[in-house]
Each structure stands twice: as C-alpha cells, then as structure tokens.
C-alpha cells in the first residue's frame, strides 16, 4: 500500500513541477508559487520519511535557490505556505 501511495505522491509532485516550470518573480502568479512550494514540501517530507530513492530515480530535485531572497515578498509567502502545507499533508498520508 505504501509503495502505491508513494508513486501517486510522486506523480503529483511531477505534475506540479511541470505546471510551475515557468515561474517568474511576479506576484500575479501566487497560485503557481503556492503550488511549487507545495510540491517542494512534499519532496521534503518524503525525503525525511525515507523515500529518497523513488525521488532520485524520477530525477526530482528541489531548487532551493528558487525562493532565496524572496521569502518576504508576496510570492515568497505563497511559496512558503505551500511548502508548509505540502510537507504537513504528505507526512499525514505517509
């Protein structure tokens, strides 16, 4: 069961990364920033819980520089909130 859940979560991460591939430093795209943060939070939770191997196999890598210096701007806040929720909810599922 857990392997199936991990694969589903991995697909969600990949879908969110594809959706947010063209992020710009623009507060008009707050939902995209939230979604990218959510995906990164999911990855963080999966790594902490010992699921690094499927992430590495899929080539999923969090770009930690993406938000650096923008934490207090509107898109940085949206990203951070998404990250926190993605990490929390993934932890609850796994």
Predicted regions span which residues?
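Short amphipathic alpha-helical heptad-repeat segments
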Residues: 2-19, 35-38
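N-terminal processing/targeting junctions
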Residues: 9, 15-18, 22, 48-61, ...
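Amphipathic alpha-helical binding modules
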Residues: 59-94
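Acidic, low-complexity, intrinsically disordered interaction modules
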Residues: 32-67
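Hydrophobic alpha-helical segments
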Residues: 17, 34-38, 42, 79, ...
